[in-house]
Amino acid sequence: MNSNQLRETFLNYFKQLDHEVVPGSSLIPENDPTLLFTNAGMVQFKDVFLGVETRPYQRAVSIQPCMRAGGKHNDLENVGYTARHHTFFEMLGNFSFGDYFKRDAIKFAWDFLTNVLKLPPQRLWVTVFQDDFESESIWLKEMKINPERFSRCGEKDNFWQMRDTGPCGPCTEIFYDHGPTISGGPPGSAEADGDRYVEIWNLVFMQYNRDAKGNLLPLAKPSVDTGMGLERLTAVMQGVHDNYDIDLFQYLLKALRTLLKTEDLHNTSMRVIVDHIRSVAFLIADGVIPSNEGRGYVLRRIIRRAVRHGYKLGQEEPFFYQLTKPLLEEMGGAYPLLRKSQALIEQTIKQEEIQFSNTLTKGLKILDHEMAGLPSRQIPGNLIFQLYDTYGFPPDLTADIARERDFVMDYAGFDKAMERQREQSQQAHQFVANYAQKASIGGETQFVGYETLNSQANVISLLQNDQPINRLNESEKGVVVLDRTPFYAESGGQVGDQGFLYFEKGSFRVKDTKKQGDIYLHIGEMLQGHLNVKDKVRAEVDVSRFDIMRNHSATHLLHEALRRVLGERVMQKGSLVEAKRLRFDFSHAKPLTPEELQAVERLVNQQIQANLLSTIEVMTPEEAKKKGALALFGERYGKEVRVLEMGDFSTEICGGTHTERTGEIGLFKIVSESGCAAGIRRIEALTGKAALDYIESAEQQLRSLSDLLKTNRKNLAAKLSQILEDHRKLEKELAKLKQRLASQQLESLINQVVDVHDIRTLAIRLEAVDRETLRAIVDQLKQKLGKAAIVLATIEEGRIQLVAGVTKNCLEHFNATELLAPIAEKVGGRSGGRPDLAQGAGERPENLEAALAAVPKWIEKKLKE
């Protein structure tokens, strides 16, 4: 049975048992900042298990893509070296939310393994938690398994909990016995660490709630969470012990063998590469882009590790991206998102490979050099950090190399170096956090800026130089915290508001607004008078907010327009919304064509002309999802979110400020489109009067150009094309004339050559030629003279141009850069180039003749050395 058949068999079995087939969730956990990646099937059901979310079903079955690289669960450094460690795997799971419990869960699992998959019971081994007598009784008395293939284990192995407090419970595990030819004892024995017995299914029974004191209290509705690794189960079904021998990996290994022109399918580097293409492709399809932090950094590490192993196999050109196609052939049917994202995956990987190529070469040279001189077989932490910080060499890549060469890593030293850098970095970010902490003693700030741009308020806290104060005097800078404010704090790409706080006999200029928790920080300067804690003020936001609102609303229209023109896989990756412009970053593998840009711009302006009504509703994140609202991927939202709808065109979760109707945006104009990272494009645009000013300026430039070229705008492109074509023809003619001039001067110059021993030498100034002509003459003289050293000079627009050439048979004595350097120095300039050809320039024409005259003596001196 192959892996595709196993997936289908598993889902169909539980579907017949009234389980809802739930698609696997993204590798990026939604609304859960505690997890870097989805690492188990239960992750998407966590809130259901916790009782904070309800689903229309009580039984579920899923196949969940999982990652074990980065964060608490990290298998990266073991991948390729063992039979079962992977960065990416698929977890088969069935779940009960207060429906069936231990008896049915055990019965379903045993029936599926022994009756559906026909696994012999004598090859299976079962474990239970030592105090879970109920599960033990079900296995031994009801399922009637062999007591000799059963063991009790402690809390470490057979008791599961999500965290220190909350839902938890015992688990029972089913192992497969690969036979006595493989070392290792049964679970629970002293020899249990061997590879003979492999866990294939874990059944978790959530029946308790652990309180803060550690007490286990029974849950009102016990639940079941099970997980079974597809790769391990496939190995069992295909009669192999090593996961890399199953169909999933063999297909990729054969494709890699063809790509690298090698016959070795069991090479560790080959295994690393085929494992890594799976995790890399799924991460990119889920919207992760290589970067230097968070999930993007994990992705970058995995790509670079694969590239390094390709380098070990002699592959120095980009190759890793070419495994995308065979991966899609093997897994694209089960995961359609992979197929939709093929171009993005290939482009992102290829760009990262190219970018890392030079880094890898430099890093390996440095590491080789340093390791050769180490007094012990430990790589110092500061070297690991230097490679990481300066050359982008991930520590686990250095660890790979250390492992291969029998070195150990000084992780403690590396951690210290990282901590020093972290402390330096944190100092720059501490300002706002410190202020917020000290300001919070005055209470929270109520934001009223959605409804109004001015309001009355009370001062609840003042801060200056990182300290709370009672009074802020004239001309002093500081931070004012109010009990209510119309000022929008920087968030979601929208810049913080500016404006004024007015009070009796004075005013405070707000230059920026930031937010920490529920505290709004009005950062600025006292223009007049003084302000005390508890004073009353009138807070007024600057009218530039209207421009910000226009740009923010236009950003939403742009996002939806991009999705409609380029496809729904386009995802927002960042934005900046300020009064003068907007910037929007989004996932896309290649530059937009002029036609695509025009289509996007036209679609946005159509919505502006339609004057769509903007409506805002407050609802739960779950309700927003059902409504089809777009959300920032991986963003953590609170219990309630604001959903902005612009007619029936755009629906997004957003906490920013917006126009009431799209017509208030006025006009939308894209001014640039560029790449800002691998797989990420950036659009900058203008709205309203700024867009109109831009268009009018462009119109004026076109008018000026038309007048200059004496043609109308309709024929402007054709006229310019003709001018450029004429220019190209003239350049060709000029090049021919220069070549002819060089040839004509050749005989005259040869007559001025002097012999310095056996080296034919010429150092002379030419008139009315440029540097390119000098080079052409030098090349021709070298061919004619045999063994020669030549220096030619000219003065072009008051600046000396120098070219020196040396034939190869002179290089044992000196080269062209050495020959030209003293001449360039004498004329107040610099020079450089190759051993056989050098160029230079200078600013002192009065010294040129003497400098050239000294060339024969310089050569003679060199010949005597």
Curated annotation (Swiss-Prot):
InterPro entries per UniProt: aa-tRNA-synth_II/BPL/LPL (IPR045864), Ala-tRNA-lgiase_IIc (IPR002318), Ala-tRNA-ligase_IIc_anticod-bd (IPR018162), Ala-tRNA-synth_IIc_core (IPR018165), Ala-tRNA-synth_IIc_N (IPR018164), Ala-tRNA_ligase (IPR050058), Ala_tRNA_ligase_euk/bac (IPR023033), DHHA1_dom (IPR003156)
Keyword Protease set for record: no
Pfam families linked: DHHA1, tRNA-synt_2c, tRNA_SAD
Cellular component annotations (GO), alphabetically ordered: cytosol
Any one GO biological process: alanyl-tRNA aminoacylation
The reaction(s) this protein catalyses: tRNA(Ala) + L-alanine + ATP = L-alanyl-tRNA(Ala) + AMP + diphosphate
Localization in the cell: Cytoplasm
Keywords: Aminoacyl-tRNA synthetase, ATP-binding, Cytoplasm, Ligase, Metal-binding, Nucleotide-binding, Protein biosynthesis, RNA-binding, tRNA-binding, Zinc
GO MF entries: alanine-tRNA ligase activity; aminoacyl-tRNA deacylase activity; ATP binding; tRNA binding; zinc ion binding
Gene3D superfamilies (alphabetical): 2.40.30.130, 3.10.310.40, 3.30.54.20, 6.10.250.550, Bira Bifunctional Protein, Domain 2, Threonyl-trna Synthetase, Chain A, domain 2
SMART domains on file: tRNA_SAD (SM00863)
Metal-binding in keyword set: yes
Coiled-coil regions, chain positions: none
Domain text: Consists of three domains; the N-terminal catalytic domain, the editing domain and the C-terminal C-Ala domain. The editing domain removes incorrectly charged amino acids, while the C-Ala domain, along with tRNA(Ala), serves as a bridge to cooperatively bring together the editing and aminoacylation centers thus stimulating deacylation of misacylated tRNAs.
NCBIfam families per UniProt: alaS (TIGR00344)
HAMAP family reported in the protein's UniProt record: Ala_tRNA_synth_B (MF_00036_B)
Role played: Catalyzes the attachment of alanine to tRNA(Ala) in a two-step reaction: alanine is first activated by ATP to form Ala-AMP and then transferred to the acceptor end of tRNA(Ala). Also edits incorrectly charged Ser-tRNA(Ala) and Gly-tRNA(Ala) via its editing domain.
Homology family: Belongs to the class-II aminoacyl-tRNA synthetase family.
Name of the protein described by the UniProt record: Alanine--tRNA ligase
Species for this entry: Coxiella burnetii (strain RSA 331 / Henzerling II)
